[in-house]
Amino acid sequence: METEVPGIFACGNVLHVHDLVDWVTEESRKAGAYAAEYVLSGCKDSSSDEVIHTVAKNGISYIVPQRLRKDNLQEEIILYFRVRDIYYDRKIVVKNKGEVIKSVKRRHLAPGEMEQVKIKTELLRNIDIDELTVEVSEEV
């Protein structure tokens, strides 16, 4: 993932603490691919690109990545996060302007376990979007 400094990419525990080395490996592959794409594009400055901000809401401590470039979305977006408390039988809800984009049931959530939610990019096409919120919600 590209940092706020153009051309500097970070992954693994430098970015945020991971529970599984598998996720570090997956993230490092992505960071390497993005770094290669950056170099092959002639080190194009992306600071003026349109972005989607990710915002932690009710029960969520943080989300990675914090920004997604609209013109560089892959087939699937993976948001990594940790919850603030221990929860049972809840939903992770991703919203755009109050409208639910995705909802995933979880039996157990704990701050010590990194969570992730995968969102198909096709769900974001043809809608006005500049912010995705993620929150813990009561299961219905």
At which residue positions do the language-model features occur?
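Residues forming the flavin
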Residues: 1-140
